[in-house]
Swiss-Prot record:
<keyword id="KW-1278">Translocase</keyword>
<dbReference type="GO" id="GO:0043531">
    <property type="term" value="F:ADP binding"/>
</dbReference>
<dbReference type="InterPro" id="IPR005294">
    <property type="entry name" value="ATP_synth_F1_asu"/>
</dbReference>
<protein>
    <recommendedName>
        <fullName>ATP synthase subunit alpha</fullName>
        <ecNumber>7.1.2.2</ecNumber>
    </recommendedName>
</protein>
<keyword id="KW-0406">Ion transport</keyword>
<keyword id="KW-0139">CF(1)</keyword>
<dbReference type="InterPro" id="IPR033732">
    <property type="entry name" value="ATP_synth_F1_a_nt-bd_dom"/>
</dbReference>
<keyword id="KW-0472">Membrane</keyword>
<dbReference type="InterPro" id="IPR000194">
    <property type="entry name" value="ATPase_F1/V1/A1_a/bsu_nucl-bd"/>
</dbReference>
<dbReference type="InterPro" id="IPR004100">
    <property type="entry name" value="ATPase_F1/V1/A1_a/bsu_N"/>
</dbReference>
<dbReference type="InterPro" id="IPR020003">
    <property type="entry name" value="ATPase_a/bsu_AS"/>
</dbReference>
<keyword id="KW-1003">Cell membrane</keyword>
<comment type="subunit">
    <text>F-type ATPases have 2 components, CF(1) - the catalytic core - and CF(0) - the membrane proton channel. CF(1) has five subunits: alpha(3), beta(3), gamma(1), delta(1), epsilon(1). CF(0) has three main subunits: a(1), b(2) and c(9-12). The alpha and beta chains form an alternating ring which encloses part of the gamma chain. CF(1) is attached to CF(0) by a central stalk formed by the gamma and epsilon chains, while a peripheral stalk is formed by the delta and b chains.</text>
</comment>
<keyword id="KW-0997">Cell inner membrane</keyword>
<feature type="site" description="Required for activity">
    <location>
        <position position="363"/>
    </location>
</feature>
<dbReference type="GO" id="GO:0045259">
    <property type="term" value="C:proton-transporting ATP synthase complex"/>
</dbReference>
<dbReference type="InterPro" id="IPR027417">
    <property type="entry name" value="P-loop_NTPase"/>
</dbReference>
Amino acid sequence: MKIKTDEVTSVLKQEIKNFKKDLQVEEVGTVLEVGDGIARVYGLTNVMSGELVEFQNGVRGQAFNLEENSVGVVIFGDYIKIEEGFSVKRVGKIFEVPVGPELLGRVLNPLGEVIDGKGPLNAKKTRPVESPAPGIAMRKSVHEPMQTGIKAIDAMIPIGRGQRELIIGDRGTGKTSIAIDTIINQKGKGVICVYVAIGQKASTVASTIEMLREKGALEYTIIVSANASEPAPMLYIAPYSGATMAEYFMYEEGKATLVVYDDLSKQAVAYRQMSLLLRRPPGREAYPGDVFYLHSRLLERAAKLDDKFGGGSMTALPIIETQEGEVSAYIPTNVISITDGQIYLQSNLFASGLRPAVDVGISVSRVGSAAQIKAMKKVAGTLKSDLAQFRDLEAFAQLGTELDPVTQAQLDRGYRVLEILKQPNNSPTPVEEQVISIFAVTKGFMDVVPTAKVREFEAFLLKTMREQHPEILEEIRTAKEVKQEAALQKTIKSIVEHFLAKNN
């Protein structure tokens, strides 16, 4: 076959005419200095605040400080491998994380990368980490209960779906335990949970994950972990990543979600470290001036959405660690003013054997009472004030004065109430059983039971109710109120008599 030269020429001319080279213009800067998770970059003149940038070794960062001659970049990842003189290019988008049902049961870092060794994530969608909180028109007032399974909280400091309830207390008072119990208690209720571990030891996070797996709670939970060994920017961004993952289920699937931030004190410390390294002016306790906004923009994302917007909700349980019970420090007062109430745990109550060590006097739920079920409202209505009176009487009795029979009876009942409110870790109680226990103690049925045997009697009472009177429990569970009070009183009275006869 002979090739004609004029044909070759015409084909070549046509190809040359159609040839277009895609020129990609990238704005590239240079690292001037780097250290402690922060880099100062020269040359990115058009970079926008909050925009992602990429270093030549693939590590990403975010433009944080826009200055006259340089840009302060926070580095998400291993900053040790970044050197002076490295090139940095703009990515042209903001920070996003993967979202969707594929994340359930997985352990991720704040960048949305899996760290549990169970294979790739295969998430189909992403959402921006910094997203605005829902507006007033999108919200609905809190009216559905978010049961924690903890008697002291569900009875006296009730939490509703869409609420922000702070858990505050010294180190080792059981703050994380309350949050984990609440997650375990959501089993079978269609609530998606996100647990954000900020600045914790890897071993602590591992044992928490194991506990959730044991209780069958991991299948509806996403774990976001920024360990203590991670650089400050990772600890700073972790809560926002967790909130974004929950927002997907709230907005796009109309589901109820629960997010635990454990704990925001460490996030504030990480943010302070970043701000000081970026040479931002320090304020009170060396925190930057916008540390309030750091937490308010995070916690305002929790809401109960109106039915027009799917009716989903995000309940936030932020945790704050205090030093020596100092609730009036900067970060605790900030978060108390942002949230809809707080559960205050006291170390001396914890040491005295009251667990959970909830200080009912200081603890409050500003919007939760609207979400409490009728049955609980009825039986526990005066419980908080009764306990406050009991504490006053207890202090008075310690003076050694002789007490009249009425005061003594009030004291004795107070001790029995405290026994009922004690609860072991990782064993949340269904709300219908809580109602029975509190009804029995507040109506005086346990006054004849010795204080030392109150918890034994409670176990016997609930076991008998489950086996012989399941219809009463079912009625409370479904109707959410005690309809046949006289019948319930009669039942409990006979169970008390049976217990005393058995133990004498």
